[in-house]
């Protein structure tokens, strides 16, 4: 099996709505594995949570948008949202080398 390096960046969203978003900084996994990327947030006004994938030197690519609580599945990627807990996660199944990237929640 080949190793896959996944990089997570910490993001803090500021502005009039007072949003804060925190993610882990990095993680390693192997091809074929299942990886869960957690994201916690605090906000005074919630309009939904986005997940993006960003490869080095490229613009972010949209993966999912959650407004309602629960699990949204889209191919090998699933995203979960709990508004009451200020928590979301992105689940990557059957990990592939092309999944080596930064993952952002916003």
Curated annotation (Swiss-Prot):
| Gene3D superfamilies noted in UniProt | Immunoglobulins (2.60.40.10)
Q: Does the keyword Cell membrane apply?
A: yes
InterPro entries for this protein: Ig-like_dom (IPR007110), Ig-like_dom_sf (IPR036179), Ig-like_fold (IPR013783), Ig_V-set (IPR013106), TCR_variable_domain (IPR051006)
Q: Name one GO cellular component term.
A: T cell receptor complex
Q: Which residues form a coiled coil?
A: none
Sites of glycosylation? 38
Could you tell me which Pfam families the record lists for this protein? Answer: V-set
Q: Please name the GO terms of the biological process aspect recorded for this protein, alphabetically.
A: adaptive immune response; response to bacterium
Where is the protein situated, by its record's location annotation?
Cell membrane
Record keywords, A-Z: Adaptive immunity, Cell membrane, Disulfide bond, Glycoprotein, Immunity, Immunoglobulin domain, Membrane, Receptor, Signal, T cell receptor
Q: Which cysteines are joined by disulfide bonds?
A: 39-105
Lineage: superkingdom: Eukaryota
Tell me where the signal peptide lies.
1-18
- Does the UniProt entry include the keyword 4Fe-4S? no
Domain (Ig-like): give its ranges. 19-106
**What does the UniProt function comment say about this protein?**
V region of the variable domain of T cell receptor (TR) alpha chain that participates in the antigen recognition. Alpha-beta T cell receptors are antigen specific receptors which are essential to the immune response and are present on the cell surface of T lymphocytes. Recognize peptide-major histocompatibility (MH) (pMH) complexes that are displayed by antigen presenting cells (APC), a prerequisite for efficient T cell adaptive immunity against pathogens.
Subunit description: Alpha-beta TR is a heterodimer composed of an alpha and beta chain; disulfide-linked. The alpha-beta TR is associated with the transmembrane signaling CD3 coreceptor proteins to form the TR-CD3 (TcR or TCR). The assembly of alpha-beta TR heterodimers with CD3 occurs in the endoplasmic reticulum where a single alpha-beta TR heterodimer associates with one CD3D-CD3E heterodimer, one CD3G-CD3E heterodimer and one CD247 homodimer forming a stable octameric structure. CD3D-CD3E and CD3G-CD3E heterodimers preferentially associate with TR alpha and TR beta chains, respectively.
Protein name as it appears in the record: T cell receptor alpha variable 1-2
Q: Which organism is it from?
A: Homo sapiens (Human)
Q: What is the lineage of its organism?
A: Eukaryota, Metazoa, Chordata, Craniata, Vertebrata
């Amino acid at each position: 099996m080949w190793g896959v390096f996944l990089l997570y960046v910490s993001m803090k969203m500021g502005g009039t709505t007072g949003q804060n978003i925190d993610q882990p900084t990095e993680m390693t996994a192997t091809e074929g594995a299942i990886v869960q990327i957690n994201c916690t947030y605090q906000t005074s006004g919630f309009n939904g949570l986005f997940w993006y994938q960003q490869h080095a030197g490229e613009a972010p690519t949209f993966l999912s948008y959650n407004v309602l609580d629960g699990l949204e599945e889209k191919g090998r990627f699933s995203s979960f949202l709990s508004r009451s807990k200020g928590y979301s996660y992105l689940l990557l199944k059957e990990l592939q080398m092309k999944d080596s990237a930064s993952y952002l929640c916003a």
